[in-house]
């Protein structure tokens, strides 16, 4: 009787290597899957390690272009920022990796998938919801949520002992006092010493960006061209170097922004499962793109459309963070936001300098900015006398509020009691 097949999302690290061995002990045939989304990984060494442990095969899939074009670029186009700060680098990678994982699972006839995500994190949710949306009949083995596995492996020391007994190669390098997840879009850091929010992240943690205090004294200036909200070309203005391929654009902006310390954030965020967590993120290139895209949006879109679009983008950011990239509500909101991007085309010049990115100019054939109307030098077609009636109409409710609540309300507003001062 043939063994049931499991496709394991494999990283080559201690956790998934031990899970691979443990699955083999449970009498499964295990195929390992690795997605190359731009992380610094020795895939050849990881493949050799998995085969040595006992994997039936190792599939390594280059997904960098797919990730940037189908996930990162749409996220910029939609303006997705979770809780107004996190640019979703890890969250976007999970549905991308899940797509590759499920494609291989179907091709290789796997009844199960397995992963090494912990039971407290967001990744377990993102992976599994994405996989169920793509293949409803797939079954999931999540060892870190299984009582027998968790009782056997209480932590890293138990895994190391198991690896030693099972002849699983373990890296001799000292483990960093934090965990890291990297891809072509960003690097995230959490856990370890970062679990104390009062402790500042050490400078040696950062790998994509250097401290703004050590940044060059000359700014890097680039022109970014957008078409329907998507970046299509970037030109470094000093050298004239031009990039059009999405991964090349992102690589250039990561390097240029990183040299100036652009895109560092240290935040506490709300996980979907209800916990708060502290994360440190480096996202230089996409930080630059978001800045340029937002500026062009304001230049080209109606004010009320912008407000509705911002509301929808916030909802979509929640969907992505929580693992619902492939959900019907996300698909619906995506289509609504894309309607707003039809005229977000033009070019934006940005200046990256010592931790900051600033837009210095913008041009678009679809701009709603009317220089003659906006000018303080000429009246143009705008009658300043019309403002009198506008002010009068908008003052009606304020006058009525004062008529009813009047002096007593104002006295309370401007008074300060001793207890009030203690709160300030």
From Swiss-Prot:
Q: Name one Pfam family in it.
A: Arginosuc_synth
Annotated metabolic or biological route of this protein: Amino-acid biosynthesis; L-arginine biosynthesis; L-arginine from L-ornithine and carbamoyl phosphate: step 2/3; Nitrogen metabolism; urea cycle; (N(omega)-L-arginino)succinate from L-aspartate and L-citrulline: step 1/1
- Entries under InterPro entries matching the protein: Arginosuc_syn_C, Arginosuc_syn_N, Arginosuc_synth, Arginosuc_synth_CS, Arginosuc_synth_type_1_subfam, AS_cat/multimer_dom_body, Rossmann-like_a/b/a_fold
State any single GO MF term. Answer: ATP binding
Matching entries from SUPFAM superfamilies are given as:
Adenine nucleotide alpha hydrolases-like (SSF52402), Argininosuccinate synthetase, C-terminal domain (SSF69864)
The top EC class is: ligase
Binding site residues for L-aspartate: 118, 122-123
Kindly state which reaction or reactions the protein catalyses.
Answer: L-citrulline + L-aspartate + ATP = 2-(N(omega)-L-arginino)succinate + AMP + diphosphate + H(+)
Please verify whether the record's keywords include Nucleotidyltransferase: no
- Report the sequence similarity comment from the record: Belongs to the argininosuccinate synthase family.
The entry's protein name is: Argininosuccinate synthase
